[in-house]
Curated annotation (Swiss-Prot):
Species whose genome carries this gene: Thermosynechococcus vestitus (strain NIES-2133 / IAM M-273 / BP-1)
Organism domain of life: Bacteria
Family: Belongs to the UPF0367 family.
Protein name: UPF0367 protein tsr0804
């Protein structure tokens, strides 16, 4: 299972969706990256493979960062903490 975390402006905790397959997770990750890079605010609706029926709609201009991680990997909890710590450090500089 792969987790895609979104950090949103003025929201202290990440919002997450999950994908079962690596290719599907990478496709969502790239879709989010492209939406962020476009600079045009639009709504992006995402769904979760783990929680069927879970939907998440975000305004792309409010996405600060995106991270994809293998949830089954032993270091996934470490990378998640490091990601947040790096984000906080960058915004405080």
């Amino acid at each position: 299972m792969y987790t895609i975390d979104l950090i949103l402006r003025h929201v202290p905790m990440p919002v997450s969706i999950e994908r079962k397959e690596s290719a599907a997770a990478m496709a969502v990750y790239q879709q989010i990256q492209q939406a962020m890079a476009s600079g045009t605010p639009t709504f992006l609706e995402l769904t979760c493979d783990r929680q069927v029926g879970k939907k998440l709609t975000v305004l792309t201009s409010e996405i600060v960062a995106v991270q994809m991680a293998d949830k089954d990997a032993p270091s996934s909890t470490i990378s998640r903490g490091g990601f947040f710590a790096q984000l906080v450090q960058q915004t405080s500089n």
